[in-house]
């Protein structure tokens, strides 16, 4: 017999489905834009594609699994653990992609003349592969033993049951809060976020310094070159800010769970924190569309070429290679 779904659960599922319906097409559009526009082929946009792939997976995989967990099916412990781990992998991948983007923007303003020889497509691909491999290691650590199996088994055996425990599948029931706080948050989330803040502060400082000094750059026009870098840096810093705003509340709630087990956490706050984490995957394409000219033009061209019912002359015959507005 299928589990009973309350009105509150139905509302939760509806919101999650809405987020997925925005996130998946939006991030597929980002990947599509990079594919069709040669001007979006530098290292920064390769890292943005990696971020978009993670966000597509959130909408297509993590949100359906979150809905399944919310319904609360009875599963074996390790089955539930496998359901819980993908979000850890994808979150870590997003953080490392954001860190790679920050380092890339720093190099663009720190060594503009040597940037293209230092940051090659091959090195960017190696960095992306390294980020995903590291994300798999961090996200699958609970599968290697850092989980709540011993606690669950103790209760399971106390009831006279044998074999692998069968539980109501819930994230906190299988994932250790020590892992989430000490390892995931304090090692793999908070330090990279703080490092990225410092990197962007240095990027803004270097750009302002160069604009004031008007030092020549590879473009031959320092105002145009560094003005463009400033705008892109602001847009990418906004992506970082939205990520932190979306994920920190849930990690703070995890800290409360670990350090104050008797403290009550209102269910509405938990759901809001979950919606923020999933909703973050839908935010980035919107930021790109409104803040980065190359993406905006490419999105419109894709729309005009593939989705308009009435043929209309394209707004740009050729996609721009460079725009000062970028």
Curated annotation (Swiss-Prot):
Q: Does the keyword Ion transport apply?
A: no
Q: Which PROSITE patterns match?
A: G_PROTEIN_RECEP_F1_1, G_PROTEIN_RECEP_F1_2
Q: Which GO terms describe its biological process?
A: adenylate cyclase-inhibiting G protein-coupled receptor signaling pathway; cognition; detection of temperature stimulus involved in sensory perception of pain; excitatory postsynaptic potential; fatty acid homeostasis; G protein-coupled purinergic nucleotide receptor signaling pathway; G protein-coupled receptor signaling pathway; leukocyte migration
InterPro entries in the cross-refs: Adeno_A1_rcpt, Adenosn_rcpt, GPCR_Rhodpsn, GPCR_Rhodpsn_7TM
Q: Which residues are glycosylated?
A: 148, 159
Q: Which residues lie on this side of the membrane: Cytoplasmic?
A: 34-46, 103-123, 202-235, 293-326
- Spell out where lipidation (S-palmitoyl cysteine) occurs: 309
Mind telling me what this protein is named? Answer: Adenosine receptor A1
- State the gene name recorded for this protein: Adora1
